[in-house]
């Protein structure tokens, strides 16, 4: 009736003015939207002068034997304590990572002084020791960088600074960053880039370059000596740009194709050193741009990682 419709409109307007009800309605809409990326995010409610976090679960209700729905039931589980613990963990990791960078930088500066011929030449044993210090310091810097990137993502403070970038510039940066590592194992890096004009990207070039650098570094570490790696880009008919890194190493068991993008996961039996963070951070960075990062791999046939971004 007109009266019931009028009352419904009044209630709807009141609900939209109420912050809590508005958030519940938005959460209800996201819960049944397959394309929504925020359906698993906790619901934040401010009451009694404090913030509380809830996990929201929605269910449709209706008469038995009828396909017609009568309404929804919303269940809220208070996860504030877990959220606070997770936040404390993220803050701790971020603080420790920042604190580690200073002594590592001091070690590297001291190492440069030791290797300066004006101070005095090193014998072969001392050169090996200096190289070991360099390698381990670089590894520590890489780990602290990954931890800082992870805390940015987990705390929701990931800030993108997009600018117009050519895909080839990102590829060249990744190759330059990994050149010494590739030469060390005598690995040839081939570039596949179409001669025809390719679209440009509007992305945070530092973060996407970091992703490509990480993928190329992984490919080198998991390749045999005297091997080869292909890095390149292509544009699809639906105007997406795909950048890929292909190696011809051991490959990844299909059982682990999803797990390798999780924090700290490492394929069982892996002997190559790593933190288990690089791929998960890479995936977060790419998805923050509205893109995807996927893997195509079989045991004994190598791996191909592809990131898709809108041109």
Question: Which positions does each model-derived feature cover?
Answer:
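Conserved catalytic submotifs in the C-terminal HATPase_c
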Residues: 127, 161-166, 183, 188-199
């Amino acid at each position: 009736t007109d009266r019931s419709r009028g009352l419904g409109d009044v209630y709807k307007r009141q609900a939209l003015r109420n912050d809590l009800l508005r958030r519940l309605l938005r959460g209800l809409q996201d819960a049944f939207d397959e394309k929504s990326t925020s359906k698993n995010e906790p619901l934040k409610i401010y009451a009694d002068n404090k913030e509380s976090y809830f996990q929201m679960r929605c269910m449709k209700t209706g008469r038995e034997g009828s396909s017609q729905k009568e309404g929804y039931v919303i269940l809220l589980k208070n996860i504030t304590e877990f959220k606070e613990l997770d936040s404390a963990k993220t803050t701790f990791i971020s603080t420790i990572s920042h604190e580690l960078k200073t002594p590592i930088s001091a070690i590297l500066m001291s190492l440069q002084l030791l290797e300066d011929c004006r101070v005095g030449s090193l014998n072969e044993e001392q050169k090996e020791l200096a190289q070991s210090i360099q390698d381990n310091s670089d590894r520590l810097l890489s780990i602290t960088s990954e931890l800082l990137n992870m805390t940015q993502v987990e705390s929701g403070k990931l800030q993108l600074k997009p600018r117009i970038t050519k895909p080839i510039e990102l590829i060249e940066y990744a190759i330059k960053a990994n050149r010494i590592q590739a030469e060390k194992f005598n690995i040839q890096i081939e570039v596949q880039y179409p001669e025809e004009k390719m679209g440009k990207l509007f992305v945070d070039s530092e973060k996407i370059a970091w992703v490509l650098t990480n993928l190329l570094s992984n490919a080198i570490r998991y390749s045999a000596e005297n091997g080869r790696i292909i890095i390149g880009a292509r544009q699809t008919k639906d105007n997406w740009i795909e950048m890929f890194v292909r190696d011809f190493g051991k490959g990844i068991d299909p059982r682990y194709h999803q797990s390798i993008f999780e924090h700290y996961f490492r394929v069982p039996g892996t002997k190559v050193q790593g933190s288990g963070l690089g791929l998960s951070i890479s995936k977060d960075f790419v998805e923050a741009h509205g893109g995807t990062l996927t893997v195509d791999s079989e045991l004994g046939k190598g791996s191909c990682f592809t990131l898709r971004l809108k041109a």
